[in-house]
């Protein structure tokens, strides 16, 4: 994350098992919501100010990323707030916390469509996760 929050000043890095850093994505501002599908073949990624969720083909052996595709543009979808923290459920759907939007949305990764929105009585919704025995 850029400490001055200047657009494009930051990068996303990977720390490998030997402790070496590798730059993976340039020209980002605020990396958020990084998660993988069940087979670790796709990495979902948010650079919050873009209000987009990108899907990168991912090689779990090398850590290499392929060319991204846009899964959803939050602004175009008419969702209030900025995408922040994100997790994935057992069905492969993304759950995205909407900072300044007071909600968590569920996005179908096959269609890129919002299938559910859960509103909260707080504006700064920044993270979501699942817990429990199952």
Task: Please provide the spans of the model-predicted regions.
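Conserved beta-strand element within WD40/beta-propeller blades
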Residues: 45, 96-97
